Design a protein with these regions (language model features):
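Juxtamembrane amphipathic/hinge helix adjacent to a transmembrane helix
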Residues: 2-11, 234-251
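Membrane-interface helix-start motif
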Residues: 15-20, 212-215, 246-269
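Juxtamembrane extracytoplasmic/periplasmic/luminal helical "stalk" adjacent to the first N-terminal
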Residues: 20-23, 27-92, 234
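Juxtamembrane or sensor-core-proximal signal-transducing alpha helices
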Residues: 37-48, 258-272
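Extracytoplasmic/periplasmic sensor domains and loops in membrane signaling proteins
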Residues: 93-111, 129-169, 202-239
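Short acidic/glycine-rich beta-turn/loop cap or linker motifs at sensory/regulatory domain boundaries
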Residues: 120-126
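Conserved beta-strands of PAS-like sensory domains
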Residues: 129-131, 140-144, 171-215, 246-252
Length: 272
């Protein structure tokens, strides 16, 4: 007895068509799954690349701000540890030497952008001030506030007069403030007097223009201040004695380049 080669109720054509449909459905489902997995993987890679890039920018920006503080301390050291400065600024301020001869004058603003230059008496009173390159009588305490000034001088005392610096807010603008005792330095021709030293203070406001320049030097785009905290990858918050500083920048977004380059290739490979 010969058994039928086909399933009862189905012709050979119907059986082949059914098999083709199953195979096609399987292949299409597999391709869709592969495509979806590839898209998800690509998005994950994009986010990871962006996160690494943004973290690197965060590191570079913090480093740039630290370097700027080191720079202002170095400049201050050159002026405060100077025998002539000790002679003309410690007990009494010699205006002719300081301002008329421009030994402590507008060049600090023109060359370094220091908006504030102050000389304080041993008691902490402001004896001399240059504001944005102009000889304007101004009290340091009015600029910084009592608590910030006290903290600065306290830190200076703990460090035995070597240059110190800190970040603060002045009228909502972040600023680096650096202070150092005025000494004779290596000048043996000037004899130090007994008693407490006078203090020299430099103030560097981080204006919008300066922040853009800092970012440009670090290859970071559009560095700026935000009045409010923003919780994203392209922001950092720095605490100061009188408030937090929120700094933002524009991400390089290198992950987007991966999407633009690989996504069309991925779609094309699926279609082909």
């Amino acid at each position: 007895m010969t058994l039928p080669l086909t399933t009862p109720g189905f012709t050979d054509a119907e059986h082949s068509k059914r098999l083709i449909n199953k195979t096609f459905t399987y292949v299409v489902t597999l391709l869709i799954a592969i495509f979806a997995a590839a898209i998800i993987s690509l998005l994950i890679i994009k986010n990871n690349v962006n996160e690494i890039s943004d973290s690197h920018d965060d590191f570079l920006l913090r480093k740039a701000l630290d370097t700027r503080q080191e720079s202002i301390r170095s400049h201050l050291k050159d002026y405060a540890e100077w025998g002539d400065a000790y002679k003309h600024l410690h007990q009494n301020v010699d205006m002719h030497w300081a301002w008329d001869k421009q030994n402590l004058g507008k060049s600090l603003y023109d060359n370094f952008g220091y908006e504030g230059v102050f000389v304080l008496s041993p008691e902490g009173a402001t004896r001399y001030s240059v504001i944005s390159g102009k000889r304007i009588p101004e009290d340091l305490e009015r600029w910084l506030g009592q608590s910030t000034k006290d903290r600065l001088l306290s830190e200076l005392s703990k460090k035995k007069g070597v240059p110190v610096s800190m970040l603060t807010l002045i009228d909502g603008i972040p600023a680096i403030v650096s202070a150092e005792w005025i000494t004779t330095g290596d000048d043996s021709s000037v004899q130090p007097l007994p008693g407490r030293p006078s203090v020299m203070v430099f103030v560097d406001k981080l204006t919008a223009k300066k922040l853009l320049a800092i970012g440009h030097d670090a290859a970071i785009k559009n560095v700026r201040i935000s009045p409010n905290e923003v919780n994203n990858q392209t922001s950092l918050t720095i605490s100061t004695p009188n408030g937090d500083v929120h700094i933002l920048w524009d991400s390089e977004n290198p992950g987007q380049a991966l999407i633009v380059y690989f996504l069309p290739l991925l779609i094309l490979s699926v279609l082909l």
